């Protein structure tokens, strides 16, 4: 886990510096990297690891409970934002989405491999593809459209995009019906190397994005630690995993990778939603920054304990 923490710090720093020196070109690089991860790396990782996944009751029920836990966490965030902190809808909407949206793709899969071992990567991929992504494309977009100041896309368009513009999900579907012969050990091992590359490339793009936001005046770096930032940290680090564990404990033996994924920091795409739908962009960027800064040292300690 130490190398992941160092890689994240180095990659974010490199991304910030790249944006300072290359300007708009760095933004093009960052978006290209994210597309490469989405359309090439993650589908390969998903296919070769899901093909080896044993789908039992714990995994199947865990997926449903994962959806439920994220929705409940988002509801907690919304209620705290509106009733306790008295936040405007665009800000409270971000807080709800933070409760809903974790960084399980760029960070979660690699962390699962580093802390739990590569035998758990298939479970981490399953959580990302079958729990987090459906919630993002449906739930997060719906909250953004309902609370933002700009008109959004229609629900049918979002659902259609979820199925036809979601390469990792397609890879998961193919892997579930593929024979084991299509996922030989050598390719599974190669996919583990790709997993280790994801944080390096992904957080370079994060660094570029944060630098762009700071340059445009949307946020300061590091962002101020406000009450809503504190709630965001609690939602991602404590509430989400606690709700999932509480729901699962009476019924199943929750896969370790599912619980670990629930603790991941806020996802980068929250900033994208904030821009598109007119949500609170500085808060969105700040929530991503702070939840990541808090999560990394905690996960580092966990890797030593485990």
Protein language model features and the residues they cover:
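Alpha-helical transmembrane segments of multi-pass small-molecule/ion transporters
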Residues: 1-306
């Amino acid at each position: 886990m130490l190398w992941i923490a160092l890689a994240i710090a180095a990659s974010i720093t490199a991304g910030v510096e790249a944006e300072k020196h290359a300007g708009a070109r760095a933004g093009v690089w960052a978006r290209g990297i994210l597309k490469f991860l989405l359309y090439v790396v993650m589908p390969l990782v998903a296919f070769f690891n899901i093909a080896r996944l044993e789908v039992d009751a714990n995994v199947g029920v865990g997926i449903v409970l994962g959806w439920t836990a994220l929705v409940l966490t988002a509801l907690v965030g919304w209620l705290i934002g509106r009733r306790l902190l008295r936040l405007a809808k665009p800000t409270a909407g971000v807080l709800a989405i933070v409760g809903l949206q974790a960084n399980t793709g760029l960070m979660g899969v690699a962390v699962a491999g580093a802390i739990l071992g590569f035998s758990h990567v298939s479970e981490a991929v399953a959580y990302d593809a079958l729990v987090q992504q459906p919630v993002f494309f449906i739930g997060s977009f719906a909250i953004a459209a309902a609370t933002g100041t700009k008109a959004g896309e229609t629900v049918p368009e979002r659902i259609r995009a979820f199925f036809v513009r979601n390469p990792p999900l397609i890879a998961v579907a193919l892997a579930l019906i593929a024979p084991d012969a299509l996922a030989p050990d050598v390719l599974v091992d190669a996919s583990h190397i790709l997993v280790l590359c994801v944080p390096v490339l992904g957080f370079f793009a994060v660094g570029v994005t944060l630098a762009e936001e700071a340059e445009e005046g949307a946020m300061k770096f590091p962002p101020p630690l406000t009450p809503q930032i504190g709630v965001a940290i609690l939602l991602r680090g404590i509430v989400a995993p606690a709700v999932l564990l509480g729901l699962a404990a009476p019924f199943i033996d929750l896969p370790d990778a599912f619980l670990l994924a629930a603790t991941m920091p806020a996802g980068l795409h929250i900033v994208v939603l904030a821009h598109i739908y007119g949500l609170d962009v500085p808060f969105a960027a700040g929530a991503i920054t702070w939840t990541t800064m808090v999560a990394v040292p905690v996960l580092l300690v966990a890797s030593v304990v485990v």
